[in-house]
Amino acid sequence: MGLPLPLLQSSLLLMLLLRLSAASTNLNWQCPRIPYAASRDFSVKYVVPSFSAGGRVQATAAYEDSTNSAVFVATRNHLHVLGPDLQFIENLTTGPIGNPGCQTCASCGPGPHGPPKDTDTLVLVMEPGLPALVSCGSTLQGRCFLHELEPRGKALHLAAPACLFSANNNKPEACTDCVASPLGTRVTVVEQGHASYFYVASSLDPELAASFSPRSVSIRRLKSDTSGFQPGFPSLSVLPKYLASYLIKYVYSFHSGDFVYFLTVQPISVTSPPSALHTRLVRLNAVEPEIGDYRELVLDCHFAPKRRRRGAPEGTQPYPVLQAAHSAPVDAKLAVELSISEGQEVLFGVFVTVKDGGSGMGPNSVVCAFPIYHLNILIEEGVEYCCHSSNSSSLLSRGLDFFQTPSFCPNPPGGEASGPSSRCHYFPLMVHASFTRVDLFNGLLGSVKVTALHVTRLGNVTVAHMGTVDGRVLQVEIARSLNYLLYVSNFSLGSSGQPVHRDVSRLGNDLLFASGDQVFKVPIQGPGCRHFLTCWRCLRAQRFMGCGWCGDRCDRQKECPGSWQQDHCPPEISEFYPHSGPLRGTTRLTLCGSNFYLRPDDVVPEGTHQITVGQSPCRLLPKDSSSPRPGSLKEFIQELECELEPLVTQAVGTTNISLVITNMPAGKHFRVEGISVQEGFSFVEPVLTSIKPDFGPRAGGTYLTLEGQSLSVGTSRAVLVNGTQCRLEQVNEEQILCVTPPGAGTARVPLHLQIGGAEVPGSWTFHYKEDPIVLDISPKCGYSGSHIMIHGQHLTSAWHFTLSFHDGQSTVESRCAGQFVEQQQRRCRLPEYVVRNPQGWATGNLSVWGDGAAGFTLPGFRFLPPPSPLRAGLVELKPEEHSVKVEYVGLGAVADCVTVNMTVGGEVCQHELRGDVVICPLPPSLQLGKDGVPLQVCVDGGCHILSQVVRSSPGRASQRILLIALLVLILLVAVLAVALIFNSRRRKKQLGAHSLSPTTLSDINDTASGAPNHEESSESRDGTSVPLLRTESIRLQDLDRMLLAEVKDVLIPHEQVVIHTDQVIGKGHFGVVYHGEYTDGAQNQTHCAIKSLSRITEVQEVEAFLREGLLMRGLHHPNILALIGIMLPPEGLPRVLLPYMRHGDLLHFIRSPQRNPTVKDLVSFGLQVACGMEYLAEQKFVHRDLAARNCMLDESFTVKVADFGLARGVLDKEYYSVRQHRHARLPVKWMALESLQTYRFTTKSDVWSFGVLLWELLTRGAPPYPHIDPFDLSHFLAQGRRLPQPEYCPDSLYHVMLRCWEADPAARPTFRALVLEVKQVVASLLGDHYVQLTAAYVNVGPRAVDDGSVPPEQVQPSPQHCRSTSKPRPLSEPPLPT
């Protein structure tokens, strides 16, 4: 039924409006964006002053006054004094105790000091009053030493140490001068008047608290005679009952205003597990050193992808553990964002989720800011809430139960006197509100693990200096309003890559970072400018960095040998489009690059930009503001557009593009000025040579192909048919494809091609003819590729007809093109269509139309599967038989749709169809010779010779009987020879004369080796030896020289290989696999499996074997069997060395009755296979023979995909030979439907085989399609039939199998998708569901007995993303009784 012409024209017009033509694709070209990361290079190496301390740095301190400065570095048993440039001054020995050379030990008197022990420095702080350096170590009960600073010459030195310890005031149960704890101690020194107060916090445990223990928190006053600390100091300590379970880690301490603060990481409560941690802030009064002012507050730091300024929004990720911290004043801009005044101090902290800083989904580290002003307000409000009687609740706890007796607000801790001094404010308190902040950098630190932090204010910006776990320093501007990091620098401190120490010291305008055994001095303004690669990025750097443009690089002025400036940048052209244009026409040229203008919204002033291409000027076009490109935070680009106009003097050829910018107004950072030249633009002359077809229907829709040279030059082109544009579909250098518009009538009209507005020379016409009219289609059924006949009028007017079949869900199309002479009928082929309907056919609408003319639709068209012939070989007819019977699968169903002809010996026979059986009566005149005659069947014009027909005779039967008798006799002789050889070899072994020549491979003995017997032939099931065929010697010089050169990289000398010929791992059709050892050049011995060939005698087959071995050379994956090497003996055949797989192949493993895997075990095996196949697919490698028998299991139960065609054993029931390929044997029951039909293999055919492998696993090795003959399998699958769901198979996994078995390869999943789907199945399996081994599935040889002798082993997790998270269970362990 045809479509009305007005409706058709409306549809064409709508398509024309909606569809983007090729003419506009040039205009839509966009400049490739440049990543911002390309403007900097963080791999640039900077050399900063450093000092190697000879041991891991434990602490650093710095001192500076108006005249002198020094750096102090503590390591185990040593305290180094350095100058301001880290030059060595002197060294003080601090241990081991008991060593006569210990200088600090000697200052405490002769001792005794206990057994010799190394001293680790735990505290290193400056006492500002004297000035002096105070150090506290891990020995001598954690006592401290005072080192006064003495100027000597131009450097500072340490005076003799003073021991801050008085024996009379210190006892095991109460030690006044015990300060440092081996578990960690933090000290802040506050000077009040002429006294120095030490605010000390130490971590404690039961062992440390038993004798000479410091206190958890204490405020100590230094004695004026520097003999120790005043006794009776205020302190708090963890109660004895919580010492073992409640460990407080003190991370950082600082003095700000009237208070001293400590930051701790500790358990959430005394009842929570030790792993449930959070961070707290401790505040003590620095004006009145009283412990009653002790306050604690919880600090919460979160990461939220979409930051919310207040609170901890739902769905954010908490980061409870503090890693490092520092307090500093901030600049005005950041102060506004933090709701504080400029210059106020802010506490910055680096937080992580777990100990190692890994956070799983979010970044590894986050940075939060806590204004000190807001912290104090929150603490004061908490105190008032507890102590004000009208607000306090009887249920509000005072907290700090690990320090004091539990009590409720406003009461003091239990047992305290209720006098004037017992007021609520004068006792330690835990503020129950928490202070919550979100990540300042909004997750932009990503995978960076920050270990150190120091914050400085530099002019109008605040910079965070961060050390990382891999020994790098990041200097980043802090700004909450940005969604990207403003780097000052990002560089490596050295080659060691060790974590940066948490504590950072400042000396003038430099910071001291410690990493490993080194200390580095890093300028706060950054180590340099060379990591900025572009001029614009260089001049946009913060002014405190002092960066400027030095010719072609960014540098500081003192480091620039030539011209250095900070005021302008030249333009840079990185790309342009198009690369060629017509000599006669105009071209719209787009320039891409940077420094064309200062801001994207800038209007280019007139006269500032001059563009020339060769000799031709290019007129600058105004920016198109109607369709601005979306901006990106990670990339940028600037564009200029100009129109290149033709110039008479311009010549054909390649020339340069020049951009000159002058007199541009200056911007905030710099101005744009200079010249940029880019070569590579070509002027060409387009040529049109042919147009086809030159006719079409009046309705239009004809696809015209214009051929010539240089047809894609420039940016605009148009094909005009009688003045109307032909819609462009495709444009390339040599062709233009367009669709003709409707014509006014039947006539020959002019056709022109315009490029760049100029007409291409030539005289061309197009002939509009009468529209074709389709009246009918016959026959009413068919199959993919079969012929149908189109009937109608004016059918030669259309260049091509489109056939479309729609089954209600999907549509397939094909084109029938060419010039035909028949006006009233046209023969075309049906499109490719796969019948998936279980009933064996599909019904739908078959439509046909010619070019843009009205179409015709035939409803109820029946699509059938294509018939497939079965080759019968030789057909013998008895003397009394006069007809031939052959089977042609599916022919009966399509017999009414196509023509069928049958010939015997070239003579036509009047055949008869009975279903799929074709009966051909022999013509009386036909003579059957002794060689027979061919039987040929032609279906729809395609002919196949199915067999040779011969006449049976008595002589032929006698010959058959004689042949059978001869074969039986040969078999008996062979059996006798086997027995004689076996007895002879056993006798020689008993006599101790065991020797084997390389040329006597036919005498190999198959004794049990304890290793799995890999693939056994039917002749060796009883364990007796099987003689191998004697092979002719193949010399190395017989092989291809290029192949030998390629193999040389993996060649292994035969002297380094020992082959245990009495330990046969497996035997197959092509050879034997032995157990052996390989000794490499370092004398490391490796157990391996050695594959040899025995049935290959041709040089070409040996070369093919070597090429398949080379395929494994570049494959490296935990689930792929690796190649150790290839050995070429002086004589004989090559051998391949592979890793020894203890548990043999996967098929024998799952079939073994001694194994008892769960469903989860079996599916996990499948997951590992999918991981290996995902890797093979990424390497563009097609396996072609994926099955359980070709997967191996090593000692850790890791599955390895193997057998890529190397000397593979052949199982007769699982392989069959293809006649066209003499040596090819195919695993038909694992092959995809399209591979069975075309013998072509792809990654999607491997996906089909993977589905069969999953089915094997869940049935524990059952043979697929056990009742289907291999030759009938293709027809079986084409009907939509598949393997049934195994008994223990989850529905979700069977759904995965069915997706692997889709008839359409494009509908099957990729191996990457399969890995994710099978992982979900594994994750959903709970409990132990054992797959029982059905008796029908058991088909194992003697090696199954070997499996039973293997002791139970744990299944270890497999590598990478194939690892199982469940608890391993021995696969050899029987299930528990239920």
Curated annotation (Swiss-Prot):
Positions in the Cytoplasmic compartment: 982-1378
Q: Name one Pfam family in it.
A: TIG
| SMART domains the UniProt entry points to | IPT, PSI, Sema, TyrKc
Please give the biological process terms from Gene Ontology that the record holds. Answer: cell surface receptor protein tyrosine kinase signaling pathway; innate immune response; positive regulation of phosphatidylinositol 3-kinase/protein kinase B signal transduction; response to virus
Task: List the keywords (alphabetical).
Answer: ATP-binding, Cleavage on pair of basic residues, Disulfide bond, Glycoprotein, Host-virus interaction, Immunity, Innate immunity, Kinase, Membrane, Nucleotide-binding, Phosphoprotein, Receptor, Repeat, Signal, Transferase, Transmembrane, Transmembrane helix, Tyrosine-protein kinase, Ubl conjugation
**Amino-acid positions noted as binding ATP in the UniProt annotation, renumbered to this chain:** 1065-1073, 1091, 1138-1141, 1189
The catalytic activity, as recorded, is: L-tyrosyl-[protein] + ATP = O-phospho-L-tyrosyl-[protein] + ADP + H(+)
Q: Where is the composition biased (Basic and acidic residues)?
A: 1013-1022
Task: Tell me which EC number(s) this protein carries.
Answer: 2.7.10.1
Protein name per UniProt:
Macrophage-stimulating protein receptor
**Species, as recorded:** Mus musculus
What is the primary gene name for this protein? Answer: Mst1r
